[in-house]
Design a protein with these regions (language model features):
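Active-site and adjacent substrate-binding regions of carbohydrate-active enzymes
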Residues: 1-168
Length: 168
């Protein structure tokens, strides 16, 4: 089980169930990928679309777990309440995933609150693939902060450690 991996998020929704609930599957999917892109008013997420198809209105989502949970937006806007809830959201998602049947896996950087790697847009060999947004090099400087009190990295590291201990 994992929240994020090296690839995009495909919104494989159970369309017959959605229809039985009176939900338009296409509109729901469009809302989800635009919300996690950050273009829906009130969205906390910062991500990008991948393989948007105008004809079918299909798209996938890209971004790191922390950025999709709102940490990046909170840091940019200096919004302390948003930062606090975004960190809780990130840890809650990992906690829920960790207690599903199976083996929980972290995407590289989830344990240190790794943000999107927007620098991929400056690399002509990588700019055409928005999946590179969450494929940036591991941030070793932030990894060292997991041992420093008061950092986001320590907060997440300790939170994930507690989840692991509960699971054991």
């Amino acid at each position: 089980n994992y929240l994020r991996c090296h690839d995009d998020i495909g919104w494989g929704l159970d369309e017959p169930v959605e229809e039985s609930l009176g939900i338009d599957p296409l509109k729901h999917k469009e809302f989800l990928y635009h919300f996690y892109e950050g273009s829906v008013p009130g969205s906390w997420a910062m991500g990008e679309l991948y393989n948007y198809d105008e004809a079918s209105k299909d798209a996938r989502s890209c971004g790191t777990t922390a950025s999709l949970c709102g940490v990046e937006r909170a840091l940019i806007t200096h919004d302390k309440p948003l930062l606090a809830i975004s960190m809780k959201r990130d840890l809650m998602m990992h906690s829920a995933m960790s207690f599903l049947r199976g083996f929980p896996m972290l995407s590289c950087g989830d344990e240190i609150v790794q943000l999107n790697g927007w620098e991929y847009k400056e690399d002509p060999d990588r700019v055409e693939d928005s999946r590179n947004l969450h494929r940036s090099p591991f941030n070793w400087e932030n990894a060292a902060k997991r041992k420093q009190a008061g950092t986001l990295q320590k907060q997440m590291w300790d939170g994930l450690k507690s989840v692991r201990e509960m699971r054991d």
